[in-house]
Amino acid sequence: MQKDALNNVRITDEQVLMTPEQLKAAFPLSLAQEAQIAQSRGIISDIIAGRDPRLLVVCGPCSIHDPETALEYARRFKALAAEVSDSLYLVMRVYFEKPRTTVGWKGLINDPHMDGSFDVEAGLKIARQLLVELVNMGLPLATEALDPNSPQYLGDLFSWSAIGARTTESQTHREMASGLSMPVGFKNGTDGSLATAINAMRAAAQPHRFVGINQAGQVALLQTQGNPHGHVILRGGKAPNYSPADVAQCEKEMEQAGLRPSLMVDCSHGNSNKDYRRQPAVAESVVAQIKDGNRSIIGLMIESNIHEGNQSSEQPRSEMKYGVSVTDACISWEMTDALLREIHKDLSGQLAVRVA
């Protein structure tokens, strides 16, 4: 690393990472797994476009810090998905990167050992190995696209991606979304602004050119064709924004922007007033709107784990409770199972009219 009076003045270390193609060679996908992911992306695109009447449910831990917990959750999730598949299309949240308002644990890729060692290469290996195992279980997977380089390492494994409230306004993330190979949801801003998400969706649908890395790890000029499979995610802001009036306002603004109204409701964050126990009430309110004839709501997002609540990420690993979130608080598996079964029951026989 060149370091002198002008270059890298505030850089203290440099580590060259393995390339995306090296990581993929170590943890490859089979042709059958590739076909499975392509199929699930197609199903999600059909739901967004109104061709598939089912409700898309992106559900799972706020973040992944323990692969064993993730696998246990996945086994339960997979069994439930099969039982509710005629009305709900369940996609498991597998979030490895966490945006922070100030500082804090940034996720499994950045700091897999949760000790400040920032062993990113180990984090990438752990993440890809886990994702391949989850795909092998037959699950479609969801994540938040945060670091612009991560999709080259892991993007082939995901069926859906989100651009978060803190990054939706970022040009870098809009450009990245335009090149992602899966459908993308754009969250409204942390202040509740819908325009932020709508403008991001419009921008990401267009072709872009930007500097990134290729599969060989080389810096390259990348050209995208634009991503037509976008939608808005209502996550609340200074106040919740999932009421019928809020949904109607989002529909109006999307139509004015020349977009087909297509939106998901995040049952956590601002919509739950940051009280994880309110997520079922939010979900039930949204389902009631669908039963009343709403056709623009295509999905729900739920933060769920094996056990409810959360715990500090700064305590020793040996003292952490199994199956409890180290970031946002989540509802328990028992509550998740009951909620999704109830939604399935409520929507069964009511979805045919939603087909565009």
From Swiss-Prot:
GO terms for molecular function: 3-deoxy-7-phosphoheptulonate synthase activity. It comes from the Bacteria. Keywords: Amino-acid biosynthesis, Aromatic amino acid biosynthesis, Transferase. It catalyses: D-erythrose 4-phosphate + phosphoenolpyruvate + H2O = 7-phospho-2-dehydro-3-deoxy-D-arabino-heptonate + phosphate. The keyword Cytoplasm does not apply. The keyword Amino-acid biosynthesis applies. Pathway: Metabolic intermediate biosynthesis; chorismate biosynthesis; chorismate from D-erythrose 4-phosphate and phosphoenolpyruvate: step 1/7. GO terms for cellular component: cytoplasm. Its EC number is 2.5.1.54. SUPFAM superfamilies: Aldolase (SSF51569). One of its GO terms (biological process) is chorismate biosynthetic process. InterPro entries: Aldolase_TIM, DAHP1/KDSA, DAHP_synth_1. There are 3 DAHP synthases, AroF is feedback-inhibited by Tyr. The other 2 DAHP synthases are Phe- and Trp-sensitive, respectively. Belongs to the class-I DAHP synthase family. Stereospecific condensation of phosphoenolpyruvate (PEP) and D-erythrose-4-phosphate (E4P) giving rise to 3-deoxy-D-arabino-heptulosonate-7-phosphate (DAHP). This is Phospho-2-dehydro-3-deoxyheptonate aldolase, Tyr-sensitive. The gene is aroF.
